[in-house]
Amino acid sequence: MKGFHAFCVILLIFGSVSEAKFDDFEDEEDIVEYDDNDFAEFEDVAEDSVTESPQRVIITEDDEDETTVELEGQDESQEGDFEDADTQEGDTESEPYDDEEFEGYEDKPDTSSSKSKDPITIVDVPAHLQNSWESYYLEILMVTGLLAYIMNYIIGKNKNSRLAQAWFNTHRELLESNFTLVGDDGTNKEATSTGKLNQENEHIYNLWCSGRVCCEGMLIQLRFLKRQDLLNVLARMMRPVSDQVQIKVTMNDEDMDTYVFAVGARKALVRLQKEMQDLSEFCSDKPKSGAKYGLPDSLAILSEMGEVTDGMMDTKMLHFLTHYADKIESIHFSDQFSGPKIMQEEGQPLKLPDTKRTLLFTFNVPGSGNTYPKDMEALLPLMNMVIYSIDKAKKFRLNREGKQKADKNRARVEENFLKLTHVQRQEAAQSRREEKKRAEKERIMNEEDPEKQRRLEEAALRREQKKLEKKQMKMKQIKVKAM
């Protein structure tokens, strides 16, 4: 019984103590539940440390409607004691926001966002430049110019072809009646008549005729304007030019005498006298008027001697020159024809150019550039004049005095040429001798056999001594003749 009473006393004491503690918590208005387990307080703290607080998401909007998300990291002080963590969390929630503590924070730029992404700049483009033909005016001009050039090329090429064919159709019967071969293109070994023009390019056509007495052949060249070139077409608007027909007849040496003669437009003769080798050497006087023979004022004459002019200006030739003066550019007869002057970079040529007995005719096509196929018929009488001139050149012969004068003129021209080129020929001969000596020395030095090398040197010395002796003998002969 005593044990039972002692147990009751202990229960009463324990109950009074627990009731006193419960009253104390009510006064402080902070109620905490206690479990029967004495370590319940520690278990609650452990659970708080394991469960992480949810991360707070802060969403900020800027002026360009861009959003950035910032995540708060975990507290680095989780490894500290649990009571300090609870007290710190409670303090942050209970303490009011201090404006002075975060002063200037919002003014700082967000360096992390600027590094990760560059700002986008949107440029306002004017609406009239986006979908307008004015934006492509340069391309439009280039395409238009290209199309114009192509169209002009096709049209100009076709027109030149039509003009050439019209000329050939008009003159074909006359040519075939005077020449055996008409239209040889030179591709075959044997001369064959093709009966058509040879196109050299878009504006030049050739026709070779042969098989006639007193001449080797006749080359006809149709030189049309460059109608296929747009720039040339624009240039001709400022300065009109005519199409031309050039006829070159190569005479046999025995069928033409020695003389140089030319007749044609005054400006054309002045230009030819400067450019052509034979006219500049044998017709040094200025072009003379042909009024003495009844020629129009637009025509002038260049002649080596008066006898040639009198012989060429017969009635029929005067008829052609008078009636077709507007179509005649120049007529050039020469036994010393070599073409234009040869201009070399280093002085005069060392030898006279090769010459041929030639009759050269240059005619202007009517129309001054605005030519039509029907205008080619007007050139047919001029072709008759060419045929007549071939026969005239064969029949014409100089008298004895004229022949002697012509020979003196040719000897004078050759002598003047030799004087001009004497120094150059001496320099050329000296360079050839030095080159020959140099080659001989190299051959001697390259000889491996000493005995043979010695013999070659002795032979070279003997040759030099013989040359010196010959020069000395010539000098003695000159002195004897002078005495």
UniProtKB/Swiss-Prot annotation:
UniProt GO cellular component terms: endoplasmic reticulum; endoplasmic reticulum membrane; multi-pass translocon complex; protein folding chaperone complex; rough endoplasmic reticulum membrane
UniProt keyword Flavoprotein present: no
Region called Disordered, residue ranges: 44-118, 424-483
Segments forming a coiled coil: 450-483
Biased composition (Acidic residues): 60-104
Ranges facing Cytoplasmic side: 21-135
Pfam families according to UniProt: CCDC47
Signal peptide (UniProt feature, chain positions): 1-20
Membrane topology: Single-pass type I membrane protein
Keywords, sorted A to Z: Chaperone, Coiled coil, Endoplasmic reticulum, Glycoprotein, Membrane, Signal, Transmembrane, Transmembrane helix
Residues bearing attached sugar chains per UniProt: N178
Membrane-spanning segments: 136-156
Localization in the cell: Endoplasmic reticulum membrane; Rough endoplasmic reticulum membrane
Residue intervals on the Lumenal side: 157-483
InterPro entries hit by this protein: CCDC47 (IPR012879)
Biased composition, class Basic residues, residue ranges: 473-483
Subunit structure: Component of the PAT complex, composed of WDR83OS/Asterix and CCDC47. The PAT complex is part of the multi-pass translocon (MPT) complex, composed of three subcomplexes, the GEL complex (composed of RAB5IF/OPTI and TMCO1), the BOS complex (composed of NCLN/Nicalin, NOMO1 and TMEM147) and the PAT complex (composed of WDR83OS/Asterix and CCDC47). The MPT complex associates with the SEC61 complex. Interacts with VCP, HSPA5, DERL1, DERL2 and SELENOS.
Family statement: Belongs to the CCDC47 family.
Purpose: Component of the multi-pass translocon (MPT) complex that mediates insertion of multi-pass membrane proteins into the lipid bilayer of membranes. The MPT complex takes over after the SEC61 complex: following membrane insertion of the first few transmembrane segments of proteins by the SEC61 complex, the MPT complex occludes the lateral gate of the SEC61 complex to promote insertion of subsequent transmembrane regions.
PANTHER family assigned to the protein according to its UniProt record, in alphabetical order: ADIPOCYTE-SPECIFIC PROTEIN 4-RELATED, PAT COMPLEX SUBUNIT CCDC47
Protein name: PAT complex subunit CCDC47
Protein's organism: Bos taurus
